[in-house]
Amino acid sequence: MTITTFAPIGAWLGSTPLSQGARAALRATSWLAPADETLHILALTTLFVSAAVVSLRLLGLVGHDHHAGRLARRLLPLTWSALAVLVLTGGLLVLNRPGRYFRSDMFIFKMGFVLLAVAWTLALQVGLSRGESYWEQTRGRQITARSGAVFALVLWSGAIICGRWIAYA
């Protein structure tokens, strides 16, 4: 089964000056494509590690000497910065071949995983804005935080796996 619903978006995006400019820039240089992919992988690693550390702490598996809320508050800016770099570097990859990406099931699944993971990260941050111990104050919040931590690990892992499969699907 192939998801073709998004193919018209890829066709439209490919006809835009932005996409044409991205293709021209990538063709004009020998270093831009590998530099973009390298930055994409480094940002992905940064994002995943920061999300994994927070998730593993919320699960109580690491960092028992660090308050979960304080740790998350320190790492979330790194997570958001890495996500911004991922959007820019991934955007260049997509703009170069939008038709291919928007016809790819793996790309659509990846974007779904990313959107859900970002939504959870926002929810985590909203809770932390109410206090560093927000997720530890009640048993229900602890269960939500732990479930969300597993959810985040699954979502970010799914995004990474689908991202790698885009090249081969």
Regions inferred by a protein language model and the residue ranges of each:
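Polytopic transmembrane helical bundles with strong interfacial aromatic enrichment
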Residues: 1-169
